[in-house]
């Protein structure tokens, strides 16, 4: 997982020389396995009750994300209340849960040269909550474990905490005068497990012009390993659509998998 984050971080920098690559790698190395673990053990804990869209546990999750960005002095997105939350009402037809209040979380690190062009990193902040609708576990339907919490450590706690670490690394780079050329948007979307609803809401109500959005990299379930590989080669970067979006990104990911 850490290798995946490093390669994503390097891809978002623009390199004009080997020395610039070295500087980018320096900030990439601030991403540590321990910090990822610390975040994930909180974010996927029982306290957050599986982060079901609109539920109390999901509200705790968005507060955790907001507090992280505040503590790291990373600005909120261009929202009316400057509070990191893009609020919405969603009709959750899956599971007949009705209408709920929920929110995307949006933060930004502004670009140094082309601030009006945007790279968007996304992950979904929600999971399925307690083991009923949307659960693949047969145990969730049997006896006393019917209300089992589904913590969503990989789906998508892994992508969520990865974005936090990437944002922190970019903020440190910016403080040293080595920030990204284009603005980077950190968009944590809600309602993914209910049908990509938070993503659809942002697409219909974009905070930043879609025509100025250069690309979107989505981080989902990146805590897996490749069981066909052995030893220290089991970490594997798998980027869907990279050959369509950027041949350079595709080539870089393939080269990294050979290491």
Report the location of each language-model feature.
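Bacterial Sec-dependent N-terminal signal peptides
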Residues: 1-23
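Alpha-helical metal-binding/catalytic segments enriched in His/Glu/Asp
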Residues: 105-107, 121-127, 132-194
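Second-shell loop/turn segments in exported
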Residues: 22-30, 46-56, 91-95, 144-156, ...
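Structural recognition of the beta-strand scaffold that forms the well-ordered cores
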Residues: 39-44, 78, 86-87, 104-108, ...
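A non-catalytic alpha/beta surface segment that caps or lines the substrate-entry region
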Residues: 51-109
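N-terminal capping segment at the start of a domain
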Residues: 25, 30-60, 72-76, 85-87, ...
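Solvent-exposed loop/turn segments at secondary-structure junctions
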Residues: 47-50, 69, 75-76, 92-95, ...
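Metal-dependent peptidase/peptidase-like ectodomains
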Residues: 114, 189-259
